[in-house]
Design a protein with these regions (language model features):
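Interaction-mediating elements
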Residues: 1-103
Length: 103
């Protein structure tokens, strides 16, 4: 159940990117995109009293090799940059599925 959370991207852009973004990750990790969630958190970063146009993409999923994480980051970054965002930070969090519950 990969969970992708974006920050610093307009929700309209996330909506437009959603199909290609999830299709890309689906292909790389060989998991159906129906198992993914994609969220857009509207946020603004600041540096020295000015807005800093930074984008963060957090991918939470079960442990995967660093090479797979790098491949995903390298595949999705240009998709986001094509929307006009210059700095994109992609990071990964490992979920402990034994401690995840749906009640």
């Amino acid at each position: 159940m990969p969970r992708i959370v974006t920050r610093g991207i307009k929700k309209e852009d996330v909506k437009e990117l959603s199909t290609v973004l999830l299709d890309t990750i689906e292909t790389i990790i060989d998991r159906p995109k129906s198992a993914f969630t994609l969220e857009a958190v509207e946020a603004t970063s600041y540096f020295d009293g000015e807005e800093a146009p930074l984008v963060y993409v957090e991918v939470s999923w079960k442990a995967r090799p660093t090479e797979v994480c790098k491949e995903v980051a390298e595949a999705i970054t240009p998709l986001i940059k094509d929307k006009g965002y210059e700095k994109v930070f992609v990071y990964f969090k490992e979920l402990d599925l034994e401690k995840e519950f749906t009640l």
